[in-house]
Amino acid sequence: MSKSRLTVFSFVRRFLLRLMVVLAVFWGGGIALFSVAPVPFSAVMVERQVSAWLYGNFRYVAHSDWVSMDQISPWMGLAVIAAEDQKFPEHWGFDVASIEKALAHNERNENRIRGASTISQQTAKNLFLWDGRSWVRKGLEAGLTLGIETVWSKKRILTVYLNIAEFGDGVFGVEAAAQRYFHKPASKLTRSEAALLAAVLPNPLRFKVSSPSGYVRSRQAWILRQMYQLGGEPFMQQHQLD
């Protein structure tokens, strides 16, 4: 290898190491800060806003209103757990059984990819990382998930998740969603309304709360059944999530 190539390789290596240190400090500081402080915006919100500007859409505003868990209907927390991650109170950030099922499904159906992200993983991804699929992003997501599971309580993870989840075009967080679609605060959401909001979470830009498709309605009904099977509101109290 020539001297010039060695110099370039050395420069790139030093740059990447320094970048990793900077990112580790940034993300570590964010995990510590947001364990107690409200989250003003997420990486997904920034990505959506910048993308809109780049496409010349200056009317788009990624909007979110932070609310604490006691300002959110307990039905909402139960609905997203029923829909997205029923083992949320038990695991340490990863649902191994669901991951194995998703991998087996994806091997058989390459054109219909199924995910297995827990609420903790989704929170880490939405808060700190860019959208998309890559092994690098998945690796970073795993590290950040372990970080928030170590530092935050389950109640804090759920609170942040509900405040940064995307519920529609420019609608982030359950308070903004409740006001936009039901003209009420998140604390007043009914069981059915909470299930409808949770039903669009797999793809909130495709599935609409304002005009739910037959699939969304069937998913809403399934979520309501799962909420009942989990035990209703006592489930949240039992796991200290309310």
UniProtKB/Swiss-Prot annotation:
Parts forming coiled coils: none
Top-level taxon in the UniProt lineage: Bacteria
SUPFAM superfamilies named among the record's database cross-references: Lysozyme-like
CC annotations in GO: peptidoglycan-based cell wall; plasma membrane
Intracellular or extracellular location(s): Cell inner membrane
Keyword match Acetylation: no
Metabolic or biological pathway, per its Swiss-Prot or TrEMBL entry: Cell wall biogenesis; peptidoglycan biosynthesis
Primary subcellular site in the record, as a coarse category: membrane
Keyword Transport: no
Sorted UniProt keywords: Cell inner membrane, Cell membrane, Cell shape, Cell wall biogenesis/degradation, Glycosyltransferase, Membrane, Peptidoglycan synthesis, Transferase, Transmembrane, Transmembrane helix
Catalyzed reaction equations: [GlcNAc-(1->4)-Mur2Ac(oyl-L-Ala-gamma-D-Glu-L-Lys-D-Ala-D-Ala)](n)-di-trans,octa-cis-undecaprenyl diphosphate + beta-D-GlcNAc-(1->4)-Mur2Ac(oyl-L-Ala-gamma-D-Glu-L-Lys-D-Ala-D-Ala)-di-trans,octa-cis-undecaprenyl diphosphate = [GlcNAc-(1->4)-Mur2Ac(oyl-L-Ala-gamma-D-Glu-L-Lys-D-Ala-D-Ala)](n+1)-di-trans,octa-cis-undecaprenyl diphosphate + di-trans,octa-cis-undecaprenyl diphosphate + H(+)
Bilayer topology term: Single-pass membrane protein
MF terms (GO), sorted A to Z: pentosyltransferase activity; peptidoglycan glycosyltransferase activity
Enzyme nomenclature, EC number: 2.4.99.28
GO biological process: cell wall organization; peptidoglycan biosynthetic process; regulation of cell shape
Enzyme class label: transferase
Residue spans crossing the bilayer: 19-39
Pfam family of the protein (one): Transgly
Family: Belongs to the glycosyltransferase 51 family.
PANTHER family per UniProt: BIOSYNTHETIC PEPTIDOGLYCAN TRANSGLYCOSYLASE, MONOFUNCTIONAL BIOSYNTHETIC PEPTIDOGLYCAN TRANSGLYCOSYLASE
Role according to the record: Peptidoglycan polymerase that catalyzes glycan chain elongation from lipid-linked precursors.
Protein name from the UniProt record: Biosynthetic peptidoglycan transglycosylase
